[in-house]
């Protein structure tokens, strides 16, 4: 069985409150900027080698109610061939995305996955 590793971990700054720095940014914009940063930090990673973008969404409503996983994949990677999926396990959504990516890599169904957690956008 293959091993799965977390190679990079990033977090956007806190600032979605009514007066916060990111109050006018949508979750998909913040996430796509995070993916772009990751790709720039790991130049040996060809973004077309990413097999899946798995997004945990604790509250799928308003701006993040659509298939935000696919939207983030398209916006962040600018590659149409990388799929995206949205997972809702409420407070465990982020943990579930890591478990899914790890299971896919260990079973040989994927080589590289990107996971992301989105939180409520309204304070």
Go through each PLM region and give its residues.
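Conserved catalytic cysteine-centered active-site region
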Residues: 25, 57-111
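Conserved active-site "lid/cap" helical segment
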Residues: 1-73
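Structural alpha/beta core scaffold segments of enzyme domains
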Residues: 44-49, 104-107, 113
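Conserved small/polar residues in nucleotide/adenosyl-binding loops
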Residues: 115-121
């Amino acid at each position: 069985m293959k091993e799965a590793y977390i190679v990079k971990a990033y977090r956007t700054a806190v600032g979605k409150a009514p007066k916060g720095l990111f109050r006018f940014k949508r979750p998909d914009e913040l996430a796509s900027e995070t993916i772009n940063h990751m790709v720039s930090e790991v130049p040996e990673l060809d973004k077309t080698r990413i097999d899946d973008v798995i997004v945990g969404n604790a509250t799928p409503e308003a701006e993040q109610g659509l298939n935000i996983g696919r939207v983030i994949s398209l916006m962040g990677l600018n590659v149409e061939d990388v799929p995206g999926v949205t997972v809702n396990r409420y407070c465990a959504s982020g943990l579930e995305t890591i478990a899914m990516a790890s299971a896919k890599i260990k079973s040989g169904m994927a080589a590289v996955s990107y996971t992301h957690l989105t939180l409520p956008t309204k304070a």
